[in-house]
Swiss-Prot record:
Gene3D superfamilies cross-referenced by the UniProt entry: P-loop containing nucleotide triphosphate hydrolases
GO molecular function, one term: ATP hydrolysis activity
Subunit structure: The complex is composed of two ATP-binding proteins (ZnuC), two transmembrane proteins (ZnuB) and a solute-binding protein (ZnuA).
Function in brief: Part of the ABC transporter complex ZnuABC involved in zinc import. Responsible for energy coupling to the transport system.
Binding site for ATP: G56, P57, N58, G59, G60, G61, K62, T63
Protein name per the record: Zinc import ATP-binding protein ZnuC
PROSITE patterns attached to this UniProt entry: ABC_TRANSPORTER_2, ZNUC
Keyword hit for Translocase: yes
Length: 246
């Protein structure tokens, strides 16, 4: 379990609120399953409106890290500290709806938040517009494409008005055109709402143009920086050969 001194954490949260609009800081995070170390010595921070991509191979710890940040996995040591009152929305990598649930896109989007949103139609309208799903609201969820499903899940995250959205491999099932559309939408969301977006990927080519910052992990962080810094210091082949060497 995570062992955090409460007084230290509260003091740190107060500092976090006053430094560079920072929403998240991770200190010395480590995590193991069945005695096998999955993550070690993870240190990072995130500011409001940032789009950060955690890049790494399958099995490198990306999903374990974002689940820890989202509060789903608490079996870690170290500190994960969020700015006070930070709201998180999390979109898992694998999400499916039962064939026994024939529901519309509109119902799926609004059901969980209807009571909160019924007096604020502007949030609903803006979310649908930002996610670009206005033309599929009456469709059955089971009938829409993989790319449209991801946009629907993104809209469901967004409608909760979060400060931080965590996306685990959000474009893995999409073709190149759907990926470009998805990344364009998250850039608009980050700018319009000043939402911080943390996503995972194993595809550097897709991640680079859409990220403010890249963190490369394979159980630990071995490179990080702005996209141009990553590319200036390492070629694609060097980056992925270093994954394979670990």
């Amino acid at each position: 379990m995570s062992h955090i001194n409460v007084e230290k954490k509260l003091n740190f949260v107060n500092k976090l609120n006053n430094v560079n609009n920072r929403v998240l800081k991770i200190e010395n995070l480590a995590l193991a399953y069945d005695g096998k170390r999955i993550l070690d010595n993870i240190n990072m921070f995130m500011e409001r409106g940032d789009i950060i991509t955690i890049l790494g191979p399958n099995g490198g710890g990306k999903t374990s890290l974002v689940k820890a940040i989202a509060g789903i996995n608490k079996n870690y040591t170290g500190n994960i500290v969020l700015a006070e009152n930070t709201k998180i929305s999390y979109m898992p990598q694998n999400f499916s709806i039962s064939n026994l649930m024939p529901i519309t896109v509109e119902y799926f989007l609004l059901n969980s938040s209807f009571k909160r949103l019924k007096k604020n139609q502007s949030i609903i309208t803006e979310t649908i517009e930002l996610a670009g799903i206005g033309n599929i609201l009456k469709n059955q969820v089971l009938e829409i494409s993989a790319g449209q499903t991801q946009l629907l899940l993104l809209a469901r995250c967004l409608i909760a008005e979060p400060d931080l959205i965590i996306l685990d491999e959000p474009v893995s099932a999409m073709d190149i055109n759907a990926r470009a559309k998805f990344y364009d939408i998250i850039n608009k969301i980050a700018k319009k709402r000043l939402v911080s977006i943390l996503m995972t990927s194993h595809d550097l080519n897709s991640a680079l143009p859409s990220s403010d910052y890249i963190i490369c992990i394979n159980n630990t962080i071995y490179c990080q920086g702005k996209p141009d810094e990553i590319m200036k210091n390492r070629t694609l082949n060097e980056i992925f050969s270093s994954y394979a060497a670990k």
